Amino acid sequence: MDFDETPSKLVPREFLAVVLAGFGNELQPLTSSHGEEPCPKALLPIANKPMIDYPLTWLEQSGISDVLLICPTAHRASISHHISDISSSSYPSLRIDLQAYEESPELAVGTCTVLRHFAHRIEKDFILIPCDFVPPPSLPLSTLINKFRIESKLDGAITVSCWFQHPDGGSVPEEWGQPAPPVPIVWDKRSGTLLHVDTPDDVDRNGEELELRMSLFSKFPKTSLSSRFQDSHVYVCKRAVIGILQQKPLFDSFREEFLPWLCKLQYQKTKQFKYGRDIYSASQNAPHSLALRHSSLYTGKTATKWPSSPTDEVDSPPQKVAPLSAPSSPVDTHDGIVGPPASLRVGVVVHETGVTGRANNLATLLELNRHFLTQTTWTLPTDQENRILIDPKSQISNDSMIGQSTRVGERTLVKHSVIGKHCVIGRMARIVGCVIFDHCVIEDGAKLDGCILGLNTKVGAKAELTRCLTQAGYEVDARGVHRHEKLEVSDWAAASSATDSDDHDSSDAAGETTDEE
C-alpha cells in the first residue's frame, strides 16, 4: 500500500446547519419596518450583540462549517451586510449560504414549508436551528450531534431534539402579549426517547387529559411526563426527513404538526411499514454509517427492523392517562437489543442547567438581556475616545452595558440596563431596567423604567415611559407620559396628522371670520 498516495476524493462534510431567520411577529413593534428600512428579527440585539450571533457561535464551536441561512427576501440585504462583516473575522470557519424566500408578516410561512422549498439544497443530514436560540455554556451542540451519530446507526433514530427548562421570567404588561405556555411531553429518560408532544389539536379536543396509545406503553412501560420544558427548535435530522416532508405537503409547523407525527412512527406499525424502509435505505450511504461499521465498538446488530406487513401489530386505540412521572426503562425486544422494534426513534436531550432561552417573544427578549447583565461588570471605557463621552458626574451601575460611541450626560442615572451604540443620553435622565437599541436619543430629564426602545427612538425632554415598547423611529413628545403601551410609528404619525389638520382647520376658520368682518 502506498501511504504517500493522495486520496482523489475528499471525505464529504457530515452535516449542514439550516438556520431559520423569520419575521418575528411576536416581537412587534420592534421588528416593524422603519420607513423603507426593515428591522430583521435576526439582528435584534441581546446584550448588544445581534441574536443570530449566538447560534452561529454555537455552530462554529461544534466544528460545523456549512451553513444554509434562510430569511425573508425583505431582510436579505441587511443580514447579508451583517454576515459579510463578521465572516472574515468573527466566524472565519463558517461558509454561509444566504438564501431568501418570499414571505410577508401577514402570511408567515412555517418551517416545514420552508424546508420543502429548499430541499434541493439540503443534500445530507442536517441541523435545524432558529436564529433566536441562546444556548448556555453547559450545552455544547456536540452533545446533540454525538447522540444522533450513535443512535441513528445503532438504534435507527431519525432525529434528535432538544428541550430545556422553561424559565420563570419576569412579569410583563398584558399589552406586550404573553408567551405561549410550554406543552406537555412524554419521554423515556433511560434511552432518551421523545414519545409524545401535545399538539394544539390535542388541547382543543381534550384539554384536561392526554390520550396515548397502549402500543406506546408496550414499548416503553415506564415513561415521564412534564410540562416544565420548552422546545428549543433545534433538531439534528437524517436527510430522509426531508423526503418524508415532501410526502406530507399539508404539514406547515415542524413543532406543532411534524414532530408529534414523527413520534408516532416509533410505535404505530402502519406508519413504520410505510416510511421505515425509505428512511433506512437512505441512511446506509451516510459517511458516518460507513465509519461506524468499521468501528471496534460496532456489534453488527441494530434495532432497526420493519414489519413484513402493516398488520403485524394492530395499533391500539388511544387511552386516557393522568400525568405521571417515573424512572424509565425500555424493553428488550430483539436478541437482547435495547429499544423498540423498528425504532425510527426521536431522540431527546432534556437540558435543565444554565439559563437557556428562545428570544421569540418580548418577555424572553427582555429577560435574556437582563440575564447577561449578571454575567458582566461595567467599567469606564479604556480608550480616550469613548471615555470622554461618559460624563464623570453620571451614575452607571455595575450591572449595566453601554455600547461604543454612546454619550451619557451629567447626573444621569443608568441602572440594570443595556444601552446600544451611538446613543445620546441627555442630562439628569433616569434609565432603570431598560433595553435601548442603537442610535436612540434620550433628552434631558426623561425617565424610563422597564422599557425596550427600538432603533432610532427619540424620547423628548422630561417624558416618562413605564414598561413601554417603541417601534424603530418612534418619537415621544417632550413631557409625554406613557405606561404599559406599544408605541408604533403609525399611531404617532396619525396623531401628528390629526393635530396638523386641526391647526389647518382653525386657520381656515379664522380667515373666514376676518373676511366676513
Question: What do the predicted segments below correspond to?
Answer:
Residues 129, 158, 264-269, 380, ...:
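Short C-terminal domain-edge/linker segments immediately following a structured domain
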Residues 382, 386-395, 400, 406-408, ...:
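A structural motif detector for beta-strand N-caps
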Residues 2-370, 514-516:
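Unchanged
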Residues 24-26, 76, 168-169, 191-192, ...:
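Generic "edge-of-domain/loop-turn" microfeature
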Residues 282-311, 447-480, 486-490:
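A broadly tuned preference for mixed-charge, low-complexity surface segments
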